[in-house]
């Protein structure tokens, strides 16, 4: 009986562990951007929604649905991925952010961050940037 219980426990642990490793395979969730100015297909160089309260609201929701699993709730990283509250403000931070959401992050053939622009609109991603600037902290 004890062996049977130990085997059952080991199988449950294995099944749970597999789910943890698979979290990176989820499909990004769609983001509703009604109320934001349409931006078109060509990416802008700077965040057009900076300090826009509607964009911050949309960005907070989009962040929680698509980014928090790796970057932490309320953008407070638990160490898995960079703390996005520390991104540089303004145009310099926009440049880095844009490059990362368009190209993702791949090292040694491993995908650390998907190309989010393949899944979410420019409007949604700039809204996330607006949210991140609203919760930014200085080191």
Question: Where do the language-model regions lie?
Answer:
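Bacterial N-terminal signal peptides that target proteins for export
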Residues: 1-10
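The canonical Cys-X-X-Cys-His
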Residues: 59, 63-73, 113, 128-132
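Electrostatic cytochrome c docking/interface patches
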Residues: 28-62
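Axial heme c-ligation environment in periplasmic c-type cytochrome domains
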Residues: 23-29, 78-85, 103-136
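Short sequence/structural segments immediately N-terminal
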Residues: 62, 137-139
């Amino acid at each position: 009986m004890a062996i049977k219980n130990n085997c059952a426990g080991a199988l449950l642990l294995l099944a749970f562990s597999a789910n943890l490793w698979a979290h990176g395979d989820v499909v990004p969730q769609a983001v509703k951007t009604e109320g934001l100015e349409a931006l078109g297909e060509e990416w802008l160089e700077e965040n057009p929604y900076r300090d826009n309260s509607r964009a911050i609201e949309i960005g907070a929701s989009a962040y929680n649905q698509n980014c928090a699993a790796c970057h932490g709730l309320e953008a407070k990283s638990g160490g898995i991925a960079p703390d996005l509250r520390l991104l540089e403000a303004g145009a310099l931070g926009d440049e880095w952010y844009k490059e990362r959401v368009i190209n993702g992050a791949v090292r040694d053939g491993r995908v650390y961050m998907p190309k989010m622009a393949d899944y979410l609109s420019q409007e949604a991603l700039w809204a996330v940037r607006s949210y991140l600037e609203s919760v930014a902290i200085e080191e």
